[in-house]
């Protein structure tokens, strides 16, 4: 469990997307090629990707004292699960926990997509192209999995997204403090008429590194209340078979196909 945690308060988010911009700038990520079009959740870009690690989504939420819906806005990134599916299914051990955060070693990643299939939050994605910054450093590596690293690789004391949030919707502190804050906010929201207000991230996958204050039930935000865990017995057997295949005269493409299909089966069974 990470000693510290993010706090996302959906009731305070203004949808300014400063967090998206800060994440792009600090990590040197390229811009998405998008159209001037509001998607189903009025988002742009449409989702998290290998080059977009922070995403702001708009959801309609009903209030008990109003006849019309209002918008609630949610900041989304990797949830940094204490016991992440992505780590458990990775055949190359390219995913690990660093100071409590879930990070990917692109030098070990073979781009099989096992982590993509296993994540119920649809966070990691395989990059479709290489991208270097002005200094010539590889920021994005083609056919490798990428996602939020909680700014651990850049050794920031406060993650970039949190440092620029103007409304206090994003906080970063010791996890117990974030949980206490979240529970108090839920009490306030219920008093304001949000009868279904709740805290998300307390128990899912052993506890998440992102604690979220919701104004409605988790499913309204596409968040599973009881997300499925990977069957570790099957996962270990799959890794054993993968290890045997990797010692044989099989190329990377064949190994990638095996890992991808196996992970889809594990995700389906979960």
Predicted region positions:
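Non-ligating segments of multi-cofactor redox enzymes
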Residues: 1-270
